[in-house]
A protein has these predicted regions:
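Structural beta-alpha unit
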Residues: 2-13, 81-115, 153-162, 166-169
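Small/aliphatic-rich secondary-structure junction motif
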Residues: 7-63, 85-89, 168-169
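Conserved acidic residues
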Residues: 16, 113, 142
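Short, structured coil segments at secondary-structure junctions
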Residues: 41, 133, 141-142
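Acidic, proline/glycine-rich short linear motifs
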Residues: 47-74, 98, 154-169
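Glycine-rich, Arg-bearing micro-motifs that act as flexible, cationic patches
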Residues: 114-136, 154-159
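Short, flexible loop segments at boundaries between secondary-structure elements
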Residues: 140-155
Length: 169
């Protein structure tokens, strides 16, 4: 069906199928919150965790076990369902440095009309040398992509410290 355009009342786009790529549950909180704020009644949400694998010799290795990967997706699905959203999720295997292709394939197969990603974790130098997952998804996606900002570490504490009187001795 695809996203619904604004109507004459100025209502913004409404997405019916949102795919959110979850790399790490704790680091993806801003992406999860963004999805909960964008989703409306009837929106379906799919949490996708890509389990990266690499070939070493004649064997495939992964940085995480199958159960660890499933927990990441399951935790996101649980959070979406607690917010009243129709949610499902899963784990997809991807070769290291082919994660973007895994996200895009899932979006195509599921017919997502919005992809939500967290901010990249790679450093700027690494991203320039090898490219970033976020950059590749943005360049190749056939549907809109939203990149949620990184979670502000200790932002409340920073604000409290900035507003408290200082001892200037």
């Amino acid at each position: 069906m695809g996203p619904q355009p604004p109507d004459e009342s100025g209502v913004t786009w409404m997405f019916t199928k949102i795919l959110v790529a979850i790399e790490d549950f704790d680091q993806s909180q801003n992406a999860l919150e963004l999805v909960k704020n964008v989703a409306t009644d009837g929106t379906q949400v799919r949490a996708l965790h890509l389990r990266e694998r690499e070939l070493s010799g004649y064997r495939w290795y992964s940085r995480e076990s199958s159960s660890e990967a499933a927990l990441v997706a399951d935790a996101a699905v649980f959070e979406f369902r607690m917010a009243g959203l129709a949610a499902g999720g899963g784990v997809r295997h991807a070769v290291v440095d082919r994660v973007a292709e895994g996200i895009l394939a899932e979006a195509r197969e599921w017919d997502a009309d919005l992809i939500v990603l967290g901010s990249p974790r790679r450093g700027e130098v690494i991203a320039r040398l090898f490219g970033s997952v976020t950059q590749r998804v943005l360049q190749r996606s056939s549907c809109p992509v939203i990149v949620a900002p990184r979670q502000a570490r200790g932002r409340q504490e920073e604000l409290a410290a900035a507003s408290s009187p200082r001892d200037h001795g």
